[in-house]
């Protein structure tokens, strides 16, 4: 915290304040509308947050980071610039972007879901039915989800049903989410166990001055949020958000879905012992599909199948941060995560007799200790060092019938515990006033099979002119597989787990970056990149690779002999909100390939080749005192179509259940027509003295773009 810094509203002369000894501030009687907040302190570059929305019913909570200036001139005038386009993590050199809470409330198609919001950024391919994040042609499950500096299980409702690594809607509501970092490649040394990207999310602190409550009702369900002080004297606060939905309007491939989630954070600052926080997120999902009781209407196998699934996910922890004067801090977190999936499917014959087709039970519990020590030795040199110990407990059993009416056979089964241990050291060095070097090293060790990896990371940034910036970053990365992969069993091996000795999937990222500040409100960023993947688990003598994995299970023996290569360029032109108008155009051109166990190179499943996004929004201040806000937001996405493998018709006809078989020698060689996805949001906010009302209509995929789910054999035709 920086004491006695100046904070003011830039557009209103005489409206401002000074932070107290703990860096806290409050500006009373701010008019309703958009405002720009500036913070300044001697020896630091000014920080600025533009177009912050102030409403009548909720106070705005801001954490304004200031970067120490390395300029050695006796006197210098620094023009305040927005840091919205940069990551909060100052050791990020390329491929990083901050997702602000303010954006979360504006972008069309976001549905208050951070995973869908980042699909507007360059390098990310969006989906309609799923919020899975595919970066540069990588599968969504290769991304790491983090909350409060801890890796957490997939935090999405109906996780891994539509796409492994994604879901339908995030359990983390924008009501409680704070400013967060999103990385698309070449990320700093403190991040590991990820090969495509990292979504580093934070929960914000609640209002420590007064209670505020929010109620939201829509077709998705009921959303209740509350925040306020636990102790005004000690500035302790709480915030929580609960959502509940039981609606038949939601459907996934003919199934009904119910969901609920809870998020919270308790914050306890102290005078001498640092700051303590207790936080958590959780969800419960139910999904089920019924079979068609009229046998005359049976056309596909799905018509005579019935399934029921129930999912649980929870993550929570206790964090403590202690500042040693103003140049060092220690943050330690003890956390736990839990995920459970219970599911089953049965098939009916024409006599309406049922036989089991699939049975799944899995429980995963992680107990985590992580600690980071950050030290600023000077205004030119900062070092960060940390470690994480993750004790993983697992119990899982998956059984599938090879053919209809046959007995279930075990596909994956295991019970026990293992550990993933990691450590890193990362430094940022201001070589000169224009050159910055970020370098570090990360390592991890898996006790399950004694596999390890040591990964250097380095980035160099050059401020060529006040408006132009060049950067280059390189890093090595690795990721362990989901636990079920290690415990796959086959007929030939009996009770022996065939994949227990699998090594990490590894990757190397190289990314260039050019940023140009066209004006205070407009930025251009161009980032070419190349990613090499190696030691990828593949099936021997086959085109299968985990780089294309989208199903929730693997049933074959794998070897670390696969490769991958992603090459492309990301371009973003963004005009930040000013006078009620903002827009962003982002584009990605890329080619994503992989080499299977047969030694042949193929397109990856997620190789769309291009993604172009266009966002625009406009706000009008209405009402007698211009206190109400009408907002219209639009997003259009044009992207390459879904890829799929051609059907092997002869093999399909010879299959006892007529299950569709694919020609794996031509994996993902087919592609559907390009997709045009349109989303919109229209909202009107009425600000009264102590309450505000917002009415909104949100449309997802109003253009009717169709996605590829798969193929089914029609038994009638």
Where are these regions (language model features)?
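Short, acidic, small-residue-rich periplasmic hinge/interaction motif at the N-terminus
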Residues: 5-10, 40-45, 55-107, 115, ...
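Short acidic/polar hinge/loop motifs at secondary-structure boundaries
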Residues: 28, 152-182
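A beta-strand signature from Gram-negative outer-membrane beta-barrel systems
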Residues: 63-64, 168-212, 223-225
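Surface-exposed extracellular loop regions of Gram-negative outer-membrane beta-barrel proteins
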Residues: 151, 156, 292-295, 340, ...
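Transmembrane beta-barrel wall of Gram-negative outer-membrane proteins
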Residues: 218-244, 254-287, 308-330, 334-336, ...
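Outer membrane beta-barrel strand-and-loop segments of large Gram-negative receptors
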Residues: 362, 366-370, 411-422, 499, ...
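Gram-negative outer-membrane beta-barrel transporters
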Residues: 530-532, 553-640
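C-terminal beta-signal and adjacent terminal beta-strands/loops
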Residues: 583, 637-659, 672-679, 683-717
